[in-house]
Amino acid sequence: MLAKISSSAKRFVHRSLVVRGNAATFPLSFSFCRRRAFSGKTSYDYREVLRTGLSDIELDDAIGLFGVMAQSRPFPSIIEFSKLLSAIAKMNKFDLVISFGEKMEILGISHNLYTYNILINCFCRCSRLSLALALLGKMMKLGYEPDIVTLNSLLNGFCHGNRISDAVALVDQMVEMGYKPDTVTFTTLIHGLFLHNKASEAVALIDRMVQRGCQPDLVTYGAVVNGLCKRGDTDLALNLLNKMEAAKIEANVVIYSTVIDSLCKYRHEDDALNLFTEMENKGVRPNVITYSSLISCLCNYGRWSDASRLLSDMIERKINPNLVTFSALIDAFVKKGKLVKAEKLYEEMIKRSIDPNIFTYSSLINGFCMLDRLGEAKQMLELMIRKDCLPNVVTYNTLINGFCKAKRVDKGMELFREMSQRGLVGNTVTYTTLIHGFFQARDCDNAQMVFKQMVSVGVHPNILTYNILLDGLCKNGKLAKAMVVFEYLQRSTMEPDIYTYNIMIEGMCKAGKWKMGGIYFVASALKE
């Protein structure tokens, strides 16, 4: 069997290297790695450090420890070096592990299968798959047979190296070589298949695992559920939950929360609530993510009473709401006209040391503007800037709209200039709001100036912009200019709507041009 595995493995390595044009051997001295200066004399005993564990070791201490170990005579065992390399790899410092592997070879310290596996994994994790394969070839020449850990590392390298067909072939070869793919193998391949938009193959792999005598575990099912939900395939995800139940595998809160969040995103809030009830009936306790997804979803769809009920339930269970929960509820209360409740939630956030985000601040600014509390809205803008939460165009648009509605378009223009100084570019909503604001203030010249500026900077007016401009011109006795704008609109790719025609008909009639108004009326009727 060993001979069979060895010959099959060598064929695999040879094909992977030669077909791809990679180097067929691994450099003896790891000469491709950068060299480091290692810390030398220190007073502590490396054995004591290794004995107490490396789970919390800092990077600088790990580098210093390697320096001490490299200068110790006799050398520490390869097992002790492996412990350190593994700890550094867990910090995602893959290049450093490879560099230390080079140093060990220079010092004459021979690697074993465990260190080879660590190094192969590091090459794969930093997208140097050709060198991982070369190192595999070298270790096999030295008499080390790859184990399932080696091959799983290579599989991960193929999946993340845009070689998904090679990854699938590797799993088949593993069986031919006498290896039994485990849940890590299949879960890695599932991640890779989703990474390359092969969802149906990933789902089919669950059945394939069972056929090969490898029962998928919670992690494997979780990987498939997560991949399906990211694509919006919630029906398939729900079917998979049923498969798990049939296989006597209990879904955990992470899997349920993933599906609930996906159902919420695709407007299946009732299905999400039903699944929430189902998970509770099965004894799975929802967490803050589960609640936040549902509360945010229900608020978005105007189901505030359901959202409030869930919040009460959440607090009763001593599950602390997070930023998402608070922000969703604040926005919901603002839209419902209950600013006092929104403010209380904001105060509760601050008490709990939860920093508001741009969405939270923008919602509150909108609430203040709706009630004409513009001073407080401006103060909230200044507060968010002081807190290094920089406003975006939506935030400024909300405040500009508030001032324009209050017939304080001059303040709106100040805010427009302020946002421009911050490097933010006004959009169609910004300019349309200002045009409307100037017309409300009976400042026809500045309204036209803003429109011209809008066009000159490449911001495209929409039909609402044109309707506001035409209405403002007609009501301010500038019918001739309105006619020019209307004719331009007709020549453009944008279609006038019923409101456009009504504005022009009313303008014509007010100016005593009844005949022309009648023509526009007929045109609007034909339009309908």
Curated annotation (Swiss-Prot):
Provide the alphabetized UniProt keywords.
Mitochondrion, Repeat, Transit peptide
Compartments it resides in? Mitochondrion
Q: What is its main location?
A: mitochondrion
Q: Name one Pfam family in it.
A: PPR_2
This protein's GO cellular component annotations are: mitochondrion
| InterPro entries, A to Z | Pentatricopeptide_rpt, TPR-like_helical_dom_sf
- Family under the similarity heading: Belongs to the PPR family. P subfamily.
Q: Per its record, how is this protein called by name?
A: Pentatricopeptide repeat-containing protein At1g62914, mitochondrial
